[in-house]
Design a protein with these regions (language model features):
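Active-site/ligand-binding loops adjacent to catalytic centers
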Residues: 2-104, 147-177
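Claisen-condensing/thiolase-fold acyl-transfer catalytic domains that form or cleave C-C bonds
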Residues: 89, 93-141
Length: 177
């Protein structure tokens, strides 16, 4: 699967221009896997989705502007673009929070959900290095975390933030420090 590294014809966003100007360190191209939420998966479907729906609001996009770039990254690297369900995304979110201590917004959990799905299907070989970008912090979408039924307590109450004045000593006390 791996091919010799080459500068991509499509560097992505403007900040990526600087990155591709640096000397190459990699000797092989990584295999790019992408995962779209099943209710908003136009690349997987092969056509725009007029009413995309998913808990992963940051990827609730029915006709992505970077469609061709995503397909090119997949095709040039021998990768895949597949769909993951909201349930798989939520399970990955819970795993990241409980096992890794990483609080992400749902869209950032989609890559983890995809790797879990591929591993369960035997399609993610052992002994490989897997890199998943989880850039969206959970506070990016706090209403989701507060109101999500999967995160409610036994009384059906959502998580409630602790509000304290904005001073270091009070915040430290609230955190038990």
């Amino acid at each position: 699967y791996a091919q010799p590294w080459k500068k991509p014809a499509h560097p992505g966003n403007p900040a990526d221009d600087d990155a591709v100007e640096l000397p190459a360190v990699a000797t092989k191209t990584p295999i790019m896997w992408g995962f779209q939420a099943a209710g908003a998966a136009p690349i997987v479907a092969g056509h725009p989705i007029t009413e995309p729906e998913t808990v992963a609001t940051a990827i609730r996009i029915g006709n992505p502007a970077s469609w061709e770039k995503a397909e090119a990254a997949r095709d040039e690297s021998g990768g895949v673009i597949e769909a993951v369900t909201d349930e798989e995304i939520l399970a990955a979110h819970r795993w990241l929070s409980s096992k890794e201590g990483v609080f992400v917004e749902p869209a950032s959990a989609s890559g983890v959900a995809g790797l879990i799905k591929k591993h369960s299907a035997g399609a993610a070989p052992a002994g490989k290095t897997w890199v998943i970008t989880v850039t969206g912090h959970g506070l990016k979408d706090p209403d989701w975390a507060i109101n999500n039924p999967a995160l409610q307590n036994e009384n059906g109450e959502g998580a409630q933030p602790t509000q304290v004045p904005q001073d270091v000593e009070t915040v430290a006390r609230a955190l038990g420090l």
